[in-house]
Amino acid sequence: MPRSRINGNFIDKTSSIVANILLQIIPTTSGEKRAFTYYRDGMLAQSEGNYAEALQNYYEATRLEIDPYDRSYILYNIGLIHTSNGEHTKALEYYFRALERNPFLPQAFNNMAVICHYRGEQAILQGDSEIAEAWFDQAAEYWKQAIALTPGNYIEAQNWLKITKRFEFE
């Protein structure tokens, strides 16, 4: 069983207390409760920069969690850690898996776009403009999906799409 920790921050303490109360009163299976505990501990470890511990908790949470919607957020957070670690291929895999379970995660589309844009920039530095354009086109598609889900967000992406003539906004 993962260790439960309460941070010294008042808001974190309050959130932990509320989460513990909800775990006790909401009618869920013991497996779902354990999955949530691992997820919560994973988020705490991730927020502290302890990515190895966070991944262990998230992997255990995915093993226990049966709800596709809840699993999508666990998988998304695993993707975030792989992105932070520079493991972009793994990150993309987890973002895809999250979107398979919950296609309404604009942040996953955005992060996938950022990775593709970065890879496009790397291709330019290596002198391969054809590969760069393919990556930029893929980034544009992901940003369009993120923007479609949350039209008021991702202003920088919208500006990039306009400047590069990859998308016209009304």
UniProtKB/Swiss-Prot annotation:
The gene is ycf3. Essential for the assembly of the photosystem I (PSI) complex. May act as a chaperone-like factor to guide the assembly of the PSI subunits. GO terms for cellular component: chloroplast thylakoid membrane. It is found in: Plastid, Chloroplast thylakoid membrane. HAMAP family: Ycf3. It holds the Pfam family TPR_1. It is a peripheral membrane protein. Belongs to the Ycf3 family. Keywords: Chloroplast, Membrane, Photosynthesis, Plastid, Repeat, Thylakoid, TPR repeat. TPR repeats lie at residues 35-68, 72-105, 120-153. This is Photosystem I assembly protein Ycf3.
